[in-house]
Amino acid sequence: MIAKVSQINLITKHNIRLHIDCDRIAELMKKASLMVGAGGSMHWERCISSLPALVICVAENQVETTRCLSKENVCKYLGFWDQVSVTDVARALVSLLQSPSKLKAMSKCAGKIVPRHSGTPCVSKHVLSLLQPLPLEQA
């Protein structure tokens, strides 16, 4: 999949770059209009940067938060890594890149989740407000 995705810039007018295990991710995120990545702590980095994302979960503990943020129009959840095809990623990329208004709306929603200079207390409060309480029999 990585080989195919890394060739995408050859067949599109969009400026698409593939970065793996990047040590300058914050710098790249400031310049990006859309990110494809995993869930987990990257969600909060993307939100504080107001960066829309296509998210592919790579661990079970990323799924629920990703679904929740997807419902809030912060990202588009594509699925778990072993269930997402190159075609799925390509279609989602094309859909968003051809709709600047969707990207802008997602960016606004992301920025509301973690406003600049808000820090951990704000993130924690918002995450807790989005989580549904467990029924007593599951607690």
Where are these regions (language model features)?
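Nucleotide-activated sugar donor-binding and catalytic core shared by glycosyltransferases
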Residues: 2-139
